[in-house]
A protein has these predicted regions:
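Bacterial N-terminal signal peptides
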Residues: 1-10
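M16/MPP (pitrilysin/insulinase) zinc-metallopeptidase core fold and M16-derived inactive scaffolds
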Residues: 55-121, 161, 180, 184, ...
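M16/insulysin-pitrilysin zinc metalloprotease superfamily fold
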Residues: 83-87, 118-149, 294-295, 315, ...
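Short acidic/His-enriched helical or mixed secondary-structure segments at domain edges of catalytic enzymes
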Residues: 151-169, 250-265, 306-311, 322, ...
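An aromatic/glycine/proline-enriched structural segment found at the starts
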Residues: 17-18, 181-182, 207, 212-275, ...
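A structural supersecondary motif
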Residues: 63, 268-272, 292-333
Length: 440
C-alpha cells in the first residue's frame, strides 16, 4: 500500500499487493500447499530459522455487504472477537495474550475479514487455542460493546476535522454515488448495533467457503495441519456471501474542494484503474514507479517538489477493491501553493501521457522494483503478508518465486501502452481539503 492510501481489502489488495508485485525476492520462498486432517487447505512456508510462527487468514465479505441500517457492524464484530471469549472476559483475555507474548487480531475491510496471529514457537499450541476460542466462542459482552460504540461515536466527531477522511469521503461519494463503497457509519447505525447483530454477522461471514490461510515459520506440515483444524475446524462449510455489483467510477469531476480551517491542504487525485488479474497489472507497476511510485526518482516528485518546492511529498499507486479499481495519488502542500501544485501535476501527467516513458526510466524502474523485493521478505511477518496477499488475490503458489521474471519481461512498449490507457489527467478527479487560495 502506498503510504498515503493504506487500504485493507484483502491483506493483499490495492497497493499492498502492488508493492509486492513491484519488487522481487533474491531467494526462493518454498511455499507448500497443505491440507488439514479435516480437509482445510492452507499455504505453508516452513522455516525454523527463527522460533516463531505467523498465521494469516482471510474471508470474503466485509463492510460493503452490511445491512444499510447497521453500517459499521462488521468492524465492531471484528474488534469484539478479542474482547472476551470462552471463559475469559475482556480483561482476562488480554492478560492471557500478554502472558503468552503473542499477538492476535481481527480486522474488517470493504470486501473481507482478516485474522493475524504471531506467536513464539514455545507458546504456539496455547496461541492456537486462543485463536480458536476467539473465533468460535466470542462472548460479545455488554461492557466492551458499549465501550467500543462510545469510542466510535467520539470518532464520528473527530473525523469531521480529519482531512484524509473528508477527502476520501468526497471521492467515494463522487465516484460511487449509489454503491456501498460510498457508505459510512453514522450515529444511528452505531446505536442500532447490538449483540444479536454481532452474532448474526459472525455467522454470516465465518465459514470455510472463502477461507484462505497462510502459515509461516517454525512449524512442520503435520503440525500446521493440526493447528488449522484447532482454529478453523469447527467452522461450517457455508457458502460464499453475497457481493455488491462491480462498479465503474462515475465520470471525473475536475476539482472538488472541501473547506477545512488549517494552514495546509491535502490533495487527492484518482482515475480509473485496473484489477490485479488484468494483463497490464505488472506493466502498471513499472509505469506507476515512473509517474509517482518511485519516491524522489518519480516524475511527479521531481517536478512538483524538487524543481518547484510546491509540496512536502507526492505519490501515486493502484488502489484495488474487489468491485472497482483506481489509480490514486496524494500530495500535501501550503494553501497558497495548491493551485500551482495541481496545475504542474496535471501538466506532468499530460506530458507522460503524450510522450511516454523512456527506456532509461523503464530500466531504472525494473532494477529498483526487482532489487528491493528482498526487503519485503526479510522476516516471517513480511513473508506471511506477501504470500498471503498473493493467495488472497488468486495467484498460483509459485508466484512469489517467478514475479521477478515477470517484472523483468516488461518492455517499453508495455509501459507506454499502460500510460496511454490509464494516465490521462483528463480522466482524474482532484479533491482538495483545506483552505486553498484561489480555489472553491
Amino acid at each position: 500500500m502506498f503510504a498515503a492510501f493504506a487500504v485493507f481489502a484483502p491483506p493483499s489488495s490495492a497497493y499492498a499487493q502492488t508493492q509486492t508485485e513491484s519488487t522481487t525476492s533474491r531467494r526462493a520462498v518454498d511455499v507448500e500447499r497443505i491440507v488439514s486432517p479435516s480437509g482445510i487447505e492452507a499455504w505453508l512456508v516452513s522455516d525454523s530459522t527463527v522460533p516463531m510462527v505467523v498465521m494469516r487468514a482471510y474471508w470474503r465479505g466485509g463492510s460493503a455487504i452490511e445491512p444499510a441500517n447497521l453500517i459499521g457492524v462488521t468492524g465492531i464484530m471484528a474488534d469484539m472477537l478479542t474482547e472476551g471469549a470462552g471463559a475469559m472476559n475482556a480483561n482476562a483475555f488480554k492478560e492471557r495474550l500478554q502472558d503468552l507474548n503473542m499477538s492476535l487480531g481481527f480486522g474488517a475491510g470493504w470486501d473481507g475479514m482478516g485474522m493475524s496471529l504471531t506467536t513464539l514457537s514455545e507458546n504456539r499450541d496455547a496461541a492456537f487455542e486462543m485463536a480458536r476460542v476467539a473465533l468460535n466462542e466470542p462472548r460479545f459482552d455488554a461492557e466492551p460493546l458499549a465501550r467500543i460504540k462510545r469510542q466510535m461515536i467520539v470518532g464520528l466527531r473527530t473525523r469531521e476535522t480529519n482531512p484524509s477522511y473528508l477527502a476520501n469521503l468526497a471521492l467515494d461519494q463522487a465516484l460511487y454515488p449509489s454503491h456501498p463503497y460510498a457508505r459510512r457509519t453514522s450515529r444511528e447505525s452505531i446505536d442500532a448495533i447490538n449483540r444479536a447483530a454481532l452474532v448474526e454477522r459472525r455467522a454470516a461471514l465465518f465459514n470455510r467457503a472463502t477461507l484462505q490461510i497462510t502459515i509461516v515459520g517454525d512449524i512442520s506440515a503435520a503440525d500446521a495441519g493440526r493447528a488449522v483444524d484447532t482454529i478453523f475446524g469447527a467452522l461450517p462449510a457455508g457458502v460464499r456471501p453475497p457481493e455488491p455489483t462491480d462498479v465503474t467510477p462515475a465520470a471525473p469531476t475536475p476539482l472538488i474542494v472541501r473547506q477545512l480551517p488549517q494552514p495546509q491542504s491535502l490533495v487527492l487525485f484518482v482515475g480509473p484503474g485496473i484489477q490485479d488479474e488484468d494483463p497490464d497489472w505488472i506493466p502498471l507497476a513499472v509505469a506507476n514507479y515512473i509517474l509517482g511510485g518511485g519516491g524522489f526518482s518519480s516524475r511527479l516528485m521531481d517536478q512538483v517538489r524538487e524543481q518547484r518546492g510546491l509540496v512536502y511529498g507526492i505519490g501515486t499507486g493502484p488502489s484495488v477493491r474487489d468491485h472497482s479499481a483506481l489509480i490514486r495519488g496524494s500530495a500535501q502542500t501550503e494553501n497558497g501553493d495548491v493551485r500551482e501544485a495541481i496545475e504542474v501535476t496535471r501538466a506532468e501527467m499530460a506530458r507522460l501521457h503524450r510522450d511516454g516513458a523512456t527506456q532509461a526510466e523503464v530500466n531504472d524502474a525494473i532494477t529498483y522494483l526487482t532489487g528491493s523485493f528482498a526487503l519485503d521478505l526479510d522476516s516471517n511477518v513480511k513473508i506471511a503478508g506477501v504470500v498471503h496477499g498473493y493467495q488472497a488475490a488468486g495467484r498460483d503458489i509459485e508466484y512469489v518465486n517467478r514475479r521477478n521474471d515477470l517484472i523483468r519481461a516488461v518492455t517499453l512498449d508495455d509501459v507506454n501502452r499502460v500510460i496511454r490507457r490509464l494516465f490521462n489527467p483528463d480522466g482524474f478527479t482532484f479533491v482538495v481539503v483545506g483552505q486553498p487560495e484561489g480555489l472553491e
